[in-house]
């Protein structure tokens, strides 16, 4: 039995996401970007004080139990200066981040990691950085015209260590920060229709040939048990398929009610959009009270989720938003 400690409150600051949206009305547990930057000290709403959207998802998650607080950075986004700018504008203090967890080895989730480490450690301490060996393969994609587009390499374990990371490079699941966060191990692929990303490639080095890598087996998710609500699953891209992710989480925590899922569902792009109807149908049995789509979910999937589950359940993410669960 995994002893994931229940938390009294979980605050999730969206440091990076694909979209910016402060105008749409939000439910009570979501504070929009405009409110957050003014609260952080901005004297006016301007280009300099607002957040910028990018192709990624980065979450700063603060779990509180009594007088104890634990802060986790889940992914960092593609570009360091923008990550640091957004955190500054939101008033997100990085110096008390207790650990970093990375979802998978793509440039747009790890590219900002070295600068994030600088912001966290200030050159004065080390911070655990949880990864797994599969994240450090070279990655690429086959374009519709047949060309191969290599992805920018992610920082190596040595590069991370040189910037203050205590690199924890293992494949297994683990509890983080006194048991307040769960980082999964490998996610079993069990659904009949979630077959991964067909255009995805990998290779061990630049001297090796590209090989098909649709399943992206290095992907991991984070889960938090919020007292009086239940388990919230954070899946940055859901390359494993969000139904597989939720099935795995239910099996790992069969004694904890499932409350919600937050993250990219990777249902955008011609091949992945075909999975939207099956995904919707297979999400229904989980009885989710909150679905918080982000990043790579795509507008067609978002429309389908809203049409099926309604606005009381579906709350889209946006950069600069703050979600509070208690």
Model-based region annotation:
Residues 61, 75, 87, 104, ...:
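Divalent metal-coordination and catalytic microenvironments
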Residues 1-69, 183-222, 226:
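Zn-dependent metallo-beta-lactamase
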Residues 98-168, 185-196, 281-289:
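Active-site HxH/HxHxD metal-binding segment of metal-dependent hydrolases
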Residues 74, 177-186, 232-235:
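Short hydrophobic-aromatic micro-motifs
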Residues 99, 106-110, 128, 208-319:
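Cap/insert and terminal regions of metallo-dependent hydrolase folds
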């Amino acid at each position: 039995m995994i002893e994931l400690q229940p938390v009294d409150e979980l605050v999730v600051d969206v440091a990076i996401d694909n979209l910016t949206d402060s105008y749409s009305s939000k439910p009570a547990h979501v504070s929009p970007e405009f409110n957050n930057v003014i609260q952080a000290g901005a004297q006016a709403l301007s280009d300099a004080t607002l957040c910028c959207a990018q192709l990624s998802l980065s979450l700063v998650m603060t779990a509180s139990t009594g007088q104890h607080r634990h802060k986790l950075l889940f992914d960092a986004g593609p570009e360091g200066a923008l990550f640091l700018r957004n955190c500054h504008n939101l008033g997100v203090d990085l110096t008390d981040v207790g650990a970093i967890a990375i979802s998978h080895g793509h440039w747009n989730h790890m590219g900002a990691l070295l600068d994030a480490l600088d912001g966290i450690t200030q050159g004065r301490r080390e911070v655990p950085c949880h990864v797994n060996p599969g994240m450090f393969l070279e990655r690429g994609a086959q374009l519709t015209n047949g060309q191969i587009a290599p992805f920018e390499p992610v920082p190596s374990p040595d590069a991370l260590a040189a910037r203050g990371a205590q690199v924890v490079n293992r494949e297994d699941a683990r509890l983080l920060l006194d048991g307040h966060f769960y980082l999964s191990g490998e996610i079993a692929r069990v659904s009949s229709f979630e077959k991964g990303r067909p255009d995805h490639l990998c290779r061990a080095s630049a001297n090796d040939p590209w090989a098909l890598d649709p399943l992206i087996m290095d992907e991991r998710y984070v889960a938090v048990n919020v007292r009086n609500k239940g388990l919230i699953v954070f899946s940055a891209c859901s390359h494993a398929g969000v139904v597989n992710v939720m099935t795995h989480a239910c099996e790992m925590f069969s004694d904890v009610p499932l409350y919600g899922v937050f993250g990219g569902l990777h249902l955008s792009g011609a091949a992945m959009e075909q999975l939207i109807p099956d995904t919707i149908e297979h999400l229904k049995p989980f009885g989710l009270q909150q679905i918080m789509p982000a990043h790579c979910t795509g507008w067609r999937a978002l429309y389908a989720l809203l049409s099926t589950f309604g606005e009381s359940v579906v709350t889209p993410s946006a950069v600069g938003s703050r979600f509070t669960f208690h």
